C-alpha cells in the first residue's frame, strides 16, 4: 500500500506535468527516495492507460526528437505540503547531478551514479 507521503509527492509531481501535456497522467517510476523533508523522483509520464504520451500540440513537441524523455523532480516538504524545488522534463544531460550541492539536498535521495 502506498504511503500518504508517496501519494502527496506524486500528486505534486503530476500537477505541472498534466498542465504541460493537457491530460491526466500516471508514472512509471524509475527511482523515488525520501529523506527527512526532501524527495527525488525519476519517472516517465504515461497516459492513464499506461501508454506513451503523444506530445503533439504541447510545449514539448519540438523537443521529442532531440532530447531524452525523462522527468526528474526534487521536492521539499514545507508548511504541511510538498513543493517542487527543481524539475527537468526532456533533456540531454543528467542535470540533477549538481542538485545535491546546489540545493543542499541530501545526496542519499539521488540515484547512485554509474561511471563506465
What does each of the following model-derived ranges do?
Residues 14-17, 53, 60, 111:
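Polar low-complexity intrinsically disordered regions enriched in Ser/Thr and small residues
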Residues 96-116:
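Extended, polar beta-sheet/loop recognition surfaces of beta-rich domains
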Residues 1, 31-35, 93-94:
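Short secondary-structure boundary segments
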Residues 69-101:
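Short beta-strand edge/turn micro-motifs at domain boundaries
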Residues 24-79:
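Mature extracytoplasmic domains of secretory-pathway proteins
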Amino acid at each position: 500500500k502506498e504511503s500518504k507521503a508517496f501519494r502527496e509527492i506524486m500528486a505534486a509531481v503530476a500537477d505541472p506535468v498534466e498542465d504541460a501535456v493537457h491530460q491526466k497522467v500516471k508514472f512509471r517510476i524509475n527511482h523515488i527516495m525520501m529523506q527527512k523533508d526532501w524527495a527525488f523522483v525519476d519517472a516517465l509520464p504515461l497516459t492513464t492507460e499506461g501508454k506513451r504520451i503523444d506530445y503533439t500540440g504541447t510545449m514539448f513537441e519540438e523537443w521529442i526528437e532531440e532530447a531524452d524523455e525523462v522527468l526528474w523532480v526534487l521536492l521539499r516538504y514545507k508548511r504541511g505540503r510538498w513543493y517542487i524545488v527543481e524539475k527537468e522534463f526532456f533533456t540531454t544531460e543528467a542535470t540533477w547531478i549538481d542538485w545535491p550541492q546546489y540545493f543542499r539536498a541530501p545526496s542519499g535521495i539521488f540515484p547512485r551514479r554509474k561511471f563506465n
